Amino acid sequence: MARVKRGVIARRRHKKILKLAKGYYGARSRVFRVAKQAVIKAGQYAYRDRRQRKRQFRALWIARINAGARQNGLSYSRLIAGLKKAAIEIDRKVLADLAVNEKAAFTAIVEKAKASLA
């Protein structure tokens, strides 16, 4: 049986990791052992932050809606309760966009929510 050395496979593995580490600072982009750790950690951060992004955007939308609602004399929670009572189904992403870019439309929605609460 012939002796099989792993040079080709090792090079392929190293190249794959170093390609993923391209753009990293210093040894993290040049030294395989360090690059491998950096790539693994980057993957962990990416996995975690894909989930955090959803939470962070929802929090941002709520903050924007709350600011817009308070300009119209209503708190965020009262606005959402009013929208539910009025059977207006607009998600927070769209509401936040309206609060920032279409103030007149947002004010009209707030007035409908107020009317359903009264």
Curated annotation (Swiss-Prot):
Keywords linked to the UniProt accession: Ribonucleoprotein, Ribosomal protein, RNA-binding, rRNA-binding
Origin species: Pseudomonas paraeruginosa (strain DSM 24068 / PA7) (Pseudomonas aeruginosa (strain PA7))
UniProt-listed GO biological process terms: ribosomal large subunit assembly; translation
UniProt keyword annotation of Iron present: no
PROSITE patterns referenced in this protein's UniProt entry, alphabetically: RIBOSOMAL_L20
NCBIfam families linked: rplT_bact
Name of the coding gene: rplT
A Pfam family it matches: Ribosomal_L20
Any one Gene Ontology molecular-function term assigned to this protein's record: rRNA binding
Function: Binds directly to 23S ribosomal RNA and is necessary for the in vitro assembly process of the 50S ribosomal subunit. It is not involved in the protein synthesizing functions of that subunit.
Classification via InterPro entries: Ribosomal_bL20 (IPR005813), RIBOSOMAL_L20_CS (IPR049946), Ribosomal_protein_bL20_C (IPR035566)
Protein name as it appears in the record: Large ribosomal subunit protein bL20
Source species taxonomy: Bacteria, Pseudomonadati, Pseudomonadota, Gammaproteobacteria, Pseudomonadales
